[in-house]
Amino acid sequence: MSVLTFPTGTYHFNDHPLFDFQLNRVVMWNHGDPAEIQARGGEITDFPSWERVLKELSAQAEAREDWAAAAGYLRMAEFFMAPDTPECHAAYDRARKIFYTHFTYLFAEQGGPIHREEVPYADGVLPCWRIVPADTSKGAILFHGGNDSLLEEFTDALLYLAQGGYTVLAFEGPGQGAALRKSGLTFTPEWEKPVGAVLDHYGAEDVTIIGVSLGGELCMRAAAMEPRIRRVVSWSVLPSIYGALMADKPAEIRAKLEHWLDENNRDAILDLYAGLAEREPLFRWSIQHSNYAYGTSDVYEYLQKARAFTIEPVAERITQDVLLLSAREDLLVDFGLYKQEIDLLKNTRSLEFAAPGRALNGQAHCNMGNTEYMLDLILNWNDRMLER
């Protein structure tokens, strides 16, 4: 297999920061064409126009048999659709069908490096990929994403890690991908449970875990509880999901919410957010998506559940080598949270922190503008840790 390369840099595709970031994600991780997106990005003003433009770009890519872009555009069209609807499921299923129909050569059945399996978990299954390197493996990397993660989106990154000499075990956990959409498994704060199921299935020991985006919290929680994890890469630094949600809120609002949540005052919280849900489509979508992925029914239940996703009670149990990767202009996670996390990690075997800036195109969430640099950084760090 040829050596993989990744796009670098960031583009201005849309004046709305979140649409602009997600359009850059289409290019960086989903094989979108920047010229096509530049020409159409300004048409996107709301969720219906997002869906329309991305589906049209997918159809155009399919017509020219650019299957990676066709699947990627459609994968991202689903992103802002109302979750758990027939239309949303149809977009997800079609994107997967395009991918698995036209990239069979990547999978073991056709002689490729990816072994596609399902790991039993709770009342469903966790989709897993096991990718084997061409030569003798240096060790195992366990990889998972975050809030809206799909295995297929990470294909190039996972293959790159395997080309670095590692056996890669990648999975969709509860709340993610097909584990959510097909098995109905919702997010659990006890991330060591799905991690343990995957490690048991493969008989894996002495692994490096990589968690991306929200996965940066999840992997740290798993590391605190799972001794088979020996090295941790938190690719987005957030010691708690609730803390990340509250980071940009005024102190008065944070105090009110804390009090109401402690008092189980559902009505006060629902009243506070009712007007916002009516006025702000983005907030409404965010709550719809969160309720679906976390198995909650309203913003009160979601905030209560989000408070359980924190490393604070278990941080002193994290004794592994740890690499924290942050982004200085992160739209989704407050950069300043790294200070709180470092203060919590008192017992790590070692701790390294990296936050590439604009000069390295690493300023955006998950350092989206320079994936290859980040993967090389991770591989070099892991090699060093294994040599100690």
Question: Regions from the language model: what does each represent?
Answer:
Residues I318-T319, L324-S326, D330:
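Short beta-strand/loop motif that positions the catalytic acidic residue
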Residues L54, A90-D135:
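N-terminal cap/lid segment of alpha/beta-hydrolase-fold proteins
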Residues P356-R388:
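Catalytic active-site module of serine/aspartate enzymes centered on a nucleophile-bearing elbow/loop
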Residues I342-Q363:
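Catalytic histidine neighborhood in serine/cysteine hydrolases
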Residues E153, G184-E205:
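Alpha/beta-hydrolase active-site loop
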Residues A157, Q320, D334-L344:
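Short alpha-helix in the alpha/beta-hydrolase fold that links the catalytic acid
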Residues A224-L303:
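Hydrolase active-site cap/lid region
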